[in-house]
A protein has these predicted regions:
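Mature catalytic domains of secreted/periplasmic carbohydrate-active enzymes
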Residues: 1-149
Length: 149
């Protein structure tokens, strides 16, 4: 979402915690606050690690702020491409694009290693359905996880 409703991150965290004291609020850029380090388009790694997100100030803030209890990293299942959206459904010419199951499984294993939360963004198509290619890759990742416990 764009905008902050007129509150700083610290004020927003305090506002959220008045209703849900144990909530893991976090922000992907700007002043650090909350308990959750958000690494948008980032990667797995320890709290306070270097170069774990594309957001320059987020990495610096993670090192300087000791309130984080856990880190999440996230990226869209749709790999980089020309034109169209990344985080939501893109364009029909990108319907065959998806990160390979091997990459997602590797990132999953690293998230487990560091105790990170790993989130994938999967946007529906124009009909509101998850693309079949995404389902296929996610089923393969699930198989890899089950077979390598």
């Amino acid at each position: 979402a764009v905008g902050d409703g007129g509150l700083s991150h610290e004020e927003t965290t305090a506002w959220v915690h008045q209703f849900q004291p144990d909530c893991f609020a976090g922000y992907n850029h700007g002043a650090p606050s909350g308990r959750l380090s958000l690494r948008e388009r980032g990667c797995a790694g320890p709290l306070g690690g270097d170069n774990l997100t594309w957001v320059e100030d987020a990495g610096k803030n993670e090192k300087a702020y000791d309130g984080y209890l856990v880190a999440e990293f996230t990226y869209p299942l749709l790999p980089p491409h020309e034109g169209g959206a990344d985080w939501f459904y893109s364009l029909p010419q990108h319907d065959s694009l998806v990160f390979p199951a091997e990459k997602i499984y590797k990132d999953y294993k690293e998230a487990v290693e560091y105790g990170n939360i790993f989130s994938l963004n999967i946007g529906p198509d124009y009909n509101g359905n998850i693309r079949e290619i995404d389902c296929k890759v996610l089923r393969e990742v699930g198989r890899m996880i089950k077979e390598n416990k």
